[in-house]
Amino acid sequence: NLYQFGKMINHMVGKSPIFSYGDYGCYCGWGGKGTPVDATDRCCFVHDCCYGRANGCDPKLSTYSYNFQNGNIVCGNKYGCLRHICECDRVAAICFGENVNTYDKKFLSSSRCRQTSEQC
């Protein structure tokens, strides 16, 4: 769920998930359209696509099992929708961590996202 995703982001990046990623670029936050503005926004685009492939549960509300081991995020559910959304969140949190050096506050609340959305 979104709370768990936020905990993963905070663990991997050390930033507030709401203030740093809740309204960033074209895809971080609610909705999404246009072309991702940078690598961080691309992480959100891929995450949105991953959520779109979830079948059988609500990615934003369903609670899955995970933990942190040696700095890594480990999903606990072995299969199914809960495993899928945990992996979506895990991969996105890692992606944010890998791209933290290109994160740019100028893309907070971006108004440039008016084009047609990319395909997943």
From Swiss-Prot:
Belongs to the phospholipase A2 family. Group II subfamily. D49 sub-subfamily. One of its GO terms (biological process) is arachidonate secretion. It catalyses: a 1,2-diacyl-sn-glycero-3-phosphocholine + H2O = a 1-acyl-sn-glycero-3-phosphocholine + a fatty acid + H(+). CDD domains: PLA2c (cd00125). Disulfide bonds join C26-C113, C28-C44, C43-C95, C49-C120, C50-C88, C57-C81, C75-C86. Transmembrane segments: none annotated. Basic phospholipase A2 that inhibits ADP-, thrombin- and arachidonic acid-induced platelet aggregation. It also exhibits anticoagulant effects upon human plasma in vitro. It induces a high hemolytic activity reaching its maximum after 24 hours. It induces a marked elevation of plasmatic levels of interleukin-6 and -10, eosinophil peroxidase and complement lytic activities and it also provokes a drastic increase of lymphocytes, monocytes and neutrophils in peripheral blood accompanied by a rapid intense migration of neutrophils to the peritoneal cavity. This is Basic phospholipase A2 Cc2-PLA2. It is an enzyme of class 3 (hydrolase). The keyword Ribonucleoprotein does not apply. Expressed by the venom gland. Its cofactor is Ca(2+). One of its GO terms (cellular component) is extracellular region. It comes from Cerastes cerastes. It is found in: Secreted. GO terms for molecular function: calcium ion binding; calcium-dependent phospholipase A2 activity; phospholipid binding; toxin activity.
